[in-house]
Amino acid sequence: MMCTAKKCGIRFQPPAIILIYENEIKGKSRQRIMPVRNFSKYSDCSRAAEQLKNNPRHKGYLEQVSLKQLEKLFSFLRGNLWGQSLAETMEQIQRETTIDPEEDLNKLDDKELAKRKSIMDELFEKNQKKKDDPNFVYDIEVEFPQDEQLQSCGWDTESAEEF
């Protein structure tokens, strides 16, 4: 299917994913409504998003829509089924998709830890400077202020005496 996705959204009643796309051959904007079936407030959003994206009926239309965006839409739907407002659901999604630097990752279970690691990997890839970037500098020299007195630690002085 030759189409370009323009917008993707969700309808709560009856539950459906709505895609607005442009047909490249005719140049017309069209709307596709993909009903969400067998989805409850206990359903896994990532699994539901994968199933919808891999559905042969919708696959051609959802090629340009990221899996992460579909997961987010399903999270909105699940929040609505739990009775949360949109603001509460957005806040919950924000908490799930950001990393708290003060959080102790040793206390997380394996599934949550894998989720946090994937978020950190995405952030690293997004912030990483590559050679092709216009503001890439190979050798960065940083000057540290020497005004302050250097503090020594006990283990520094002990190891200096050994040598």
Curated annotation (Swiss-Prot):
Cellular component terms per the entry's GO annotation: centriole; centrosome; ciliary basal body; cytosol; nucleoplasm; spindle pole
Pfam families: CEP19
Keyword list, A-Z: Cell projection, Cilium, Cilium biogenesis/degradation, Cytoplasm, Cytoskeleton
Compartments, as annotated in UniProt: Cytoplasm, Cytoskeleton, Microtubule organizing center, Centrosome, Centriole; Cytoplasm, Cytoskeleton, Spindle pole; Cytoplasm, Cytoskeleton, Cilium basal body
GO biological process per UniProt: cilium assembly; microtubule anchoring at centrosome; vesicle targeting, trans-Golgi to periciliary membrane compartment
Keyword Cytoplasm belongs to the record: yes
Coiled-coil ranges (or none): none
Job description of the protein: Required for ciliation. Recruits the RABL2B GTPase to the ciliary base to initiate ciliation. After specifically capturing the activated GTP-bound RABL2B, the CEP19-RABL2B complex binds intraflagellar transport (IFT) complex B from the large pool pre-docked at the base of the cilium and thus triggers its entry into the cilia. Involved in the early steps in cilia formation by recruiting the ciliary vesicles (CVs) to the distal end of the mother centriole where they fuse to initiate cilium assembly. Involved in microtubule (MT) anchoring at centrosomes.
Subunit structure: Interacts with CEP43; this interaction is required for its localization to the mother centriole. Interacts (via residues 121-150) with RABL2B. Interacts (via C-terminus) with CEP350; this interaction is required for its localization to the mother centriole.
Family per similarity comment: Belongs to the CEP19 family.
Protein name: Centrosomal protein of 19 kDa
Protein species of origin: Bos taurus
Annotated gene: CEP19
